[in-house]
């Protein structure tokens, strides 16, 4: 089976090209054009070339004398070309503003002026490859359907080829536009051409162009208003009104109501602000009046809108809260808490919006405790004995007179831990003095050892330990690194031995007082513990008695009312639970006896690791 396709009649017919150009021009101007194109697109040249497309028959579905249906594979790489002419906008700002609403555009004066440039585009070197479904009928013409995108490549030449980015932009844009044209518009164009060639009777008659009905301009002066006056308030005759024109000047404008003109102007410009995306603003009423005088209640004085503003305080206020703790002073440790500073900026966020709630008027309570009083001037104490005799009085005065926001210097003897004593090199540990040692020291004071100069000793009784050891701290600055030169007893003053004996006696009295205070404290603690134990025992006895009484009452009630049906099940459950608990305890005991090493290891794992001790 052979087919003969004659390409020469199409290329030689001049009327064919004219009809094809008209159809292509209509198709190019049918769809909306981009804003950069400011004029219609005209097809100036169209040439199919001398090289026909290559057709390969893949399938024939229907074949007769007057109809044909088949699937073809088309490949075209000929010398056809197409030339288009139009005008483009060279000012991009004009293109941007023309595509945006007027109420959102900046509206420049001269920068957005139009600048149009003629453009000529030539499409050549067209390469097509596609699968085509072709249906031919003498009654219905030729129908072509592309199953895929037929355009492979295309060369675009224009008047802006010297500018690289413009050439690339045109190449990309025209290729995209031409693909849509071939897939959508080209089959319709070919169908209309086939009807003109083979079926002239089936060509649809074009609708007669409707005559453009120009709207007649309405002259408002044709029906002049009653009692018309000019700008100066003088009445006008009907003859004078007919001689006026719309562009006559202020005399013509005075014939109309200024109020109505203002309303019409506001109505015409209302679309500039009536946006659908207007945000909802609370406590705001939008009104469509042109001005304050146009309202019906214009005679009344307008209500003043309250000024809504927020005030924030930026002045900071400092408050000092002091606390006192007698127990801490009794132990010799000064209690010092950091001051609480409340700045104004910290409470600004809490104060904002306080008027929104019903409980907003409630103010924050501020309690200021003033523990400051007249500072007591403590008399200088020269000897240790005087400080020990006035220890109780000075302790109470310091706790009441000295504010806790300042450093407190206790006059009582401070207790020092033994760990700190072992670490310091300036502290000496020795046994507490007894009567024998004090007398021996008093007798040795006259010997050669008494030649050492006197050193002030500060007694600091330590915590109660098993050995009842006490620590006495000497000032390290009083001990020079080099040994002091020994002097004979004859060079020392005669009153030196008496001073040493007095100091030894005072030291012994201090130790005795401290020991007595410690014993009293221990006795008080023991008495408190005994009282607590007695109270706990009494409470336990009372609880047991109450439980016994309740059980007796329940038994009496059960005896009177008889056993309830549910009580038997409760008793059985309690007995069963007791039996199970005993069985579990017995098994745990047996398991521990079988493998005691495992349980000992598990207990050892619960012991925490030793604390870190630096070497």
UniProtKB/Swiss-Prot annotation:
SMP-LTD domain: which residues? Answer: 1-195
Q: Locate the region Disordered.
A: 293-313, 346-566, 596-615
Highest taxon of the lineage:
Eukaryota
Compartmental location: Mitochondrion outer membrane
User: Which GO terms are recorded in the biological process aspect for this UniProt protein?
Assistant: mitochondrial genome maintenance; mitochondrion organization; mitochondrion-endoplasmic reticulum membrane tethering; phospholipid transport
Give the GO cellular component terms, alphabetically: ERMES complex
Give the membrane topology: Multi-pass membrane protein
InterPro entries per record: Mdm34, SMP_LBD
Per the record, the similarity remark reads: Belongs to the MDM34 family.
Q: What job does the chain carry out?
A: Component of the ERMES/MDM complex, which serves as a molecular tether to connect the endoplasmic reticulum (ER) and mitochondria. Components of this complex are involved in the control of mitochondrial shape and protein biogenesis, and function in nonvesicular lipid trafficking between the ER and mitochondria. Mdm34 is required for the interaction of the ER-resident membrane protein mmm-1 and the outer mitochondrial membrane-resident beta-barrel protein mdm10.
Query: What note about domains is in the entry?
Result: Lacks alpha-helical transmembrane segments, suggesting that it resides in the membrane via beta-sheet conformations similar to those predicted for other outer membrane proteins and porin.
Quaternary context: Component of the ER-mitochondria encounter structure (ERMES) or MDM complex, composed of mmm-1, mdm10, mdm12 and mdm34.
What is the name of the protein in this document? Mitochondrial distribution and morphology protein 34
Q: Which organism is it from?
A: Neurospora crassa (strain ATCC 24698 / 74-OR23-1A / CBS 708.71 / DSM 1257 / FGSC 987)
């Amino acid at each position: 089976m052979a087919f003969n396709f004659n390409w020469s009649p199409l290329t030689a017919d001049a009327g064919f090209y004219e009809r094809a150009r008209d159809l292509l021009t209509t198709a190019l101007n049918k769809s909306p054009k981009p804003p950069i194109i400011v004029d219609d697109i005209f097809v100036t040249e169209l040439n199919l070339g001398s090289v026909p497309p290559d057709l390969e028959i893949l399938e024939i579905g229907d074949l007769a004398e007057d109809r044909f249906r088949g699937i073809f594979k088309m490949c075209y790489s000929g010398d056809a070309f197409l030339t288009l002419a139009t005008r483009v906008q060279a000012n991009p700002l004009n293109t941007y503003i023309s595509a945006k609403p007027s109420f959102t555009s900046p509206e420049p004066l001269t920068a957005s002026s139009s600048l149009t440039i003629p453009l000529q585009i030539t499409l050549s070197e067209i390469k097509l490859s596609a699968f085509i479904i072709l249906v031919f009928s003498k009654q219905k013409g030729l129908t072509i359907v592309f199953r895929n995108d037929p355009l492979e490549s295309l060369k675009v030449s224009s008047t802006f080829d010297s500018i690289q980015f413009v050439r690339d932009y045109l190449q990309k844009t025209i290729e995209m536009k031409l693909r849509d044209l071939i897939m959508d518009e080209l089959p319709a164009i070919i169908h209309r051409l086939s009807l003109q060639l083979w079926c002239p009777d089936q060509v649809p008659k074009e609708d007669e162009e409707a005559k453009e009905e120009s709207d007649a301009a309405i002259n408002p002066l044709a029906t002049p208003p009653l009692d018309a006056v000019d700008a100066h308030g003088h009445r006008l005759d009907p003859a004078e009104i007919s001689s006026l024109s719309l562009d006559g000047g202020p005399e013509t404008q005075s014939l109309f109501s200024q109020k109505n003109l203002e309303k019409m102007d506001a109505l015409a410009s209302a679309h500039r602000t009536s946006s659908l995306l207007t945000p909802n603003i609370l406590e705001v009423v939008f009104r469509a009046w042109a001005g304050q005088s146009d309202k019906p209640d214009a005679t009344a004085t307008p209500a003043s809108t309250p000024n809504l503003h927020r005030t924030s305080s930026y002045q900071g206020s400092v408050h000092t809260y002091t606390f006192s703790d007698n127990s801490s002073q009794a132990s010799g440790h000064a209690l010092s808490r950091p001051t609480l500073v409340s700045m104004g900026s910290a409470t600004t966020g809490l104060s904002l919006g306080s008027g929104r709630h019903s409980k907003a008027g409630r103010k924050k309570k501020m309690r200021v405790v003033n523990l400051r009083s007249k500072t007591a001037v403590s008399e200088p104490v020269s000897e240790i004995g005087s400080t020990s005799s006035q220890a109780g009085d000075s302790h109470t005065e310091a706790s009441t007179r000295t504010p806790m926001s300042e450093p407190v210097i206790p006059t009582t003897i401070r207790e020092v831990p033994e760990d700190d004593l072992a670490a310091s090199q300036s502290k000496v540990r020795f046994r507490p003095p007894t009567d024998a040692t004090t007398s021996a020291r008093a007798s040795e004071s006259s010997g050669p050892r008494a030649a050492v100069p006197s050193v002030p000793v500060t007694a600091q009784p330590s915590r109660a330990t098993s050995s009842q050891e006490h620590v006495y701290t000497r000032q390290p600055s009083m001990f020079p690194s080099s040994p002091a030169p020994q002097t004979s007893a004859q060079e020392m003053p005669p009153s030196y031995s008496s001073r040493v004996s007095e100091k030894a006696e005072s030291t012994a009295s201090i130790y005795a007082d401290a020991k007595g205070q410690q014993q009293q404290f221990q006795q008080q603690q023991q008495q408190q513990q005994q009282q607590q134990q007695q109270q706990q025992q009494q409470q336990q006895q009372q609880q047991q008695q109450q439980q016994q009484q309740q059980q007796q009452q329940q038994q009496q009630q059960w005896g009177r009312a008889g056993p309830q049906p549910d009580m038997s099940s409760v008793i059985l459950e309690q007995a069963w639970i007791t039996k199970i608990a005993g069985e579990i305890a017995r098994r745990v005991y047996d398991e521990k006896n079988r493998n005691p090493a495992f349980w000992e290891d598990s207990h050892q794992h619960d012991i925490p690791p030793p604390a870190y001790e630096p070497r």
